[in-house]
Design a protein with these regions (language model features):
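Catalytic-site signature segments of enzymes, centered on catalytic residues
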Residues: 35, 47-48, 113-201, 210-213
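Carbohydrate-binding/catalytic loop surfaces
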Residues: 121-124, 199-216, 263-267, 273-278
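Active-site helix/loop module of the DD-peptidase/beta-lactamase fold
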Residues: 71-110, 159, 172-213, 217, ...
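A short, well-structured edge-of-sheet supersecondary motif
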Residues: 12-45, 300-302, 307-311
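Active-site-proximal loop and beta-strand segments within enzyme catalytic domains
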Residues: 15, 44-60, 68-153
Length: 331
């Protein structure tokens, strides 16, 4: 472990947790952990140090889908989603899996940050939150909808993610829990508990699309996941091909269209997006950096070029993102 100016500043941010919200900071580079500091509150300790990812879970969803493709459950990410009855007569049935993964579903008139100041409200209505309903229930609002155009613009929203993972679960079927174990327990080597959130834990609701994207794991297991993704990216393997494919097929966000909605103190303030992952930081557009971002300051950043990983967890985002995240990755 290092004890430098960065480490000391991070400690001050952690000590001032009630103001900064920072609870965990882990920096991995040159094949070892160089900073590993935490200041958990009683709620986190009570939950066995498991940390909620929020929208970092969207990126975990993509990783699961990549494995589902590699295991042969899904032909490719270019398949149309019109073979899942839940999506019938909605714009999502007219999309490919890659299009929903890239947030280019053509749904901006109905949901998402392009038109509405939220990622999960249908038509911007507070009583129509897609994150609280199964995909089947949410699709009742989308009946008769058509996507904007074939090559639609980036529109960040929770519905595309929900459609993507629950379509994958539909294709994997009864093997889904076995697939999760194969990915996270066997391949990644997770040591502690982990799980995705669901809107319903009833087995009968699985066919309706009940899984959400929020993911829970310990800091140490987030590092294991990030290291595995980094190693996969550099490997001659199917999942490596998938990770390189989503990077090669990333799309431009056009952030100027989001001036009031983008959190510029987060990984969301990047210029490109692909496969539920943010790419292309300002000043780092020529570097391959997988930037994963979650509400309230959650960050998992994998610098593929320099083999550096940064994991940040917080209960609210008032920490100095520019100093302990952006500048660390840029240097």
């Amino acid at each position: 472990m290092v004890d430098n100016k960065l480490s000391q500043y991070v400690q001050k941010q952690l000590d001032n947790r009630d103001k900064t919200g920072l609870v965990n900071y882990l920096l991995y580079e040159n094949g070892k952990i160089v900073i590993n500091k935490k200041n958990y509150n009683d709620v986190i300790k009570k939950n066995k140090n498991v940390l909620r990812s929020n929208s970092i879970g969207k990126s975990m969803i993509s990783y699961v889908i990549g494995h589902a493709v590699c295991e042969g459950y899904i032909d490719s990410v270019n398949v149309k989603l019109d073979d899942w009855i839940v999506l019938n007569d909605t714009l999502y049935a007219d999309n490919t899996l890659l299009q929903v993964l890239n947030m280019t579903s053509g749904d901006e008139d109905y949901i998402g940050e392009t038109k509405f100041n939220d990622d999960g409200l249908f038509n911007g209505e507070r009583n129509k939150q897609v994150n609280r309903r199964t995909v089947a229930e949410s699709m009742l609002w989308f009946k008769g909808t058509k996507k904007k155009k074939e090559n639609s613009r980036y529109n960040y929203n929770a519905m595309s993610t929900g459609v993507a993972i629950n379509y994958a679960i539909h294709k994997v079927g009864k093997d889904y829990e076995k697939l999760l174990k194969k990915i996270f327990a066997d391949h990644v080597g997770i040591k502690d508990t982990f799980h995705f959130m669901k809107v319903s834990w009833s087995p009968k609701d699985v066919v309706k699309g009940s899984q959400r994207y929020s993911f829970f794991a310990t800091s140490e297991d987030y590092l294991r996941i990030a290291k595995t993704i980094m190693n996969d990216y550099h490997s001659d393997s199917c999942i490596g091909d998938y990770l390189r494919f989503i990077y090669d097929n990333r799309i431009k966000k056009k952030l100027k269209d989001y001036p009031r909605r983008t959190n510029y103190q987060s990984a969301a303030a990047t210029y490109e997006y692909g496969g539920q992952i943010h790419f292309s930081y300002k000043g780092m557009k020529d570097r391959v950096i997988f930037a994963m971002d979650g509400f309230a300051g959650q960050q998992m950043i994998i610098d593929m070029d320099n083999k550096r990983i940064l994991i940040v967890n917080s209960i609210d985002q008032h920490y100095n993102w520019n100093k302990i995240v952006y500048k660390v990755i840029k240097n």
